[in-house]
Amino acid sequence: MLVNIIFLDYERHDFTQQVKNHNFSNAGYDFSFTQVEMKGISRALNYGISRSKAFDAIVTMANDILMPDSWLLRMVEAALNIPNTGMCGIHCVEGINPLQTINGIQIHPQDASFGNVLIPMAAIEKIGYFNEAYDPYGMQDSDYAFRLKMTGHINYYLHDLRSEHIGHDVGQDTPYRKMKDEGLSKCDYLWARETQKYHDNNDYTIFLNEYP
């Protein structure tokens, strides 16, 4: 499995080098990477996807999450053994569901997997790109996970692994935090609007013109 990491590095670079040094050295599996400094999480991920067509999977990676040893090896093993993998993640934030075993792989199935996730290109080819309506910051990961689930994919965390979010900035008076708060304030409205649109049209795909 050929993997391309889409490394999101917009605006705040406090932990960029630390995260790259750590996550790139302990992955346990070969990879390529595309570093994107672009406003809007969906827009940045979509640009990365457009540069990943020769790969079998992507990994979405934030510049403030540290991954455990052999994280990519474990992700690849899971995706190869669970053919309908949507988002394969390593638990970082939010809750985690009970353990299940699928094809010998221990996982925690989720509605959405947050943090850094592996997404097979086969899943991307089925549902397309991230929804840029949530940009610059919002529920783009939940939206993508919802569309994956509705098209027969399974989103999950790997068992017995934990990643660490080192970029906590809640309450900070910075332009970056203000951008996030503004995006989050629109989440409920956008989520209701976009998911209703998918249901009404019975269409969970988003295909965009290729990025230059």
Model-derived features: positions:
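N-proximal low-complexity "stem/linker" segments adjacent to membrane-targeting elements
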Residues: 1-18
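Short, acidic, metal-binding catalytic loop of nucleotide-sugar glycosyltransferases
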Residues: 19-29
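Glycine-rich, basic loop-to-helix element that forms the pyrophosphate-binding segment
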Residues: 36-52
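Short beta-strand-to-loop acidic/aromatic patch adjacent to the donor-nucleotide binding site
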Residues: 55-66
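A recurrent flexible, glycine/aromatic-enriched loop bordering the glycosyltransferase active site
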Residues: 101-121
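Aromatic-glycine-rich donor-binding/catalytic loop that engages nucleotide-sugar donors
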Residues: 119-138, 147-153
